[in-house]
UniProtKB/Swiss-Prot annotation:
Principal subcellular localisation of the protein: secreted
Function: Blocks potassium channels.
Protein location: Secreted
Protein's recorded name: Peptide 2
Single Gene Ontology MF annotation: potassium channel regulator activity
Domain of life of the organism encoding this protein: Eukaryota
Homology family: Belongs to the short scorpion toxin superfamily. Potassium channel inhibitor family. Alpha-KTx 09 subfamily.
Amino acid sequence: VGCEEDPMHCKGKQAKPTCCNGVCNCNV
């Protein structure tokens, strides 16, 4: 599928959540 940024994953944080195959990681 690949990876894409999901800005709605982390609220109230200046982060770029990267979602890969349903797994999201918040990069603060």
